[in-house]
A protein has these predicted regions:
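ABC-type ATPase nucleotide-binding domains, specifically the catalytic core motifs of the NBD
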Residues: 21, 39, 100-120, 128-133, ...
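ABC ATPase C-loop
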Residues: 156-157
Length: 264
């Protein structure tokens, strides 16, 4: 779906083990995501989806293996080095300063990202969000839920990132606003930004994604084009309900998870 022709992976997890103390969440995880694509991470709660984003953003260091961004090993990198590599993270929930204006939130967000000045980039970012632009002097708390999520994404875009990690962007948003957010992510990917996304709204997310990766207990159990998974009528039950998933055989046989989901 992406307009970018890039066979070389932008993101690569190679035998990654990561977790907290003695509890490992990612277990020998390996996968690749190409430049200018949207890769959707699927799986039940506790599968390790959000942990993938956290390890890539340096919030959790791998115990084993390598995480590469265009060949750069991010495993031992500092937050400053990761930002310099162009990795932006939009976590779950609301992470704004409610009493500050839209402009002030963007300005402070730029400072947090280590930028010396954001004045020239703020107008550039606001062009993506016409409704937010109209309320540039309004307090963030006065924005709708959708406008607040757009503002959070806008702060990430100040970095002009080559990779955006986004965790559950549809939470608390109306279907119309979710469609706008997804449309923006697709536009960014088509212009070269690599997007790694966790999203419970599986069918809608698959429609804008290029690849889908299914995790279970921190392990890769399936990776295939999103369009192929979208054709499965049991897709949401399959990847949110914890059914064990295995890749389809070369002759097109159904996955074991599809068979389980189809059973009465």
């Amino acid at each position: 779906m992406s307009l970018i022709n890039a066979n070389q992976p932008c993101i690569e997890f190679d035998d990654v083990v990561a977790g907290y103390k003695d509890f490992m969440i990612l277990n020998n995880l390996s996968f690749k995501a190409k430049k200018g694509t949207i890769t959707l991470l699927l799986g039940p709660n506790g599968a390790g989806k959000s942990t993938v984003l956290k390890t890539l953003f340096g919030l959790l260091k791998p115990r084993q293996g390598h995480i590469l961004l265009d060949g750069f090993d991010v495993g031992g990198a500092t937050q400053k080095q990761l930002l310099a590599q162009g990795i932006a993270f939009v976590p779950q929930g609301r992470n704004l300063f409610g009493q500050l204006s839209v402009f002030e939130n963007l300005e402070l967000g730029g400072i947090t990202l280590g930028m010396k000045t954001t004045h020239e980039r703020i107008p550039e970012v606001l062009e993506f969000f016409p409704r937010v632009k109209e309320r540039i002097n309004s307090a963030a708390s006065a924005l709708s839920g959708g406008e607040q999520k757009q503002l959070e994404i806008g702060r990430a875009l100040l970095l002009r990132p080559k990779v955006i990690l986004i965790d559950e962007p549809s939470i608390g948003l109306s279907p119309m606003v979710v469609a706008d957010v997804f449309k923006l992510l697709r536009k960014l990917a088509d212009h070269g930004t690599t997007v790694l996304m966790v999203e419970q709204n599986v069918k809608s997310a698959l429609k804008i994604s290029d690849e889908a990766i299914a995790l279970e207990s921190g392990r890769l159990v399936l990776q295939k084009p999103a369009s192929e998974l979208l054709a499965d009528p049991h897709i949401e039950r399959l990847f949110l309900g914890g059914a064990h998933t295995q890749a389809a055989s070369a002759n097109g046989a159904p996955t074991t998870a599809s068979a389980a989901a189809a059973a009465p």
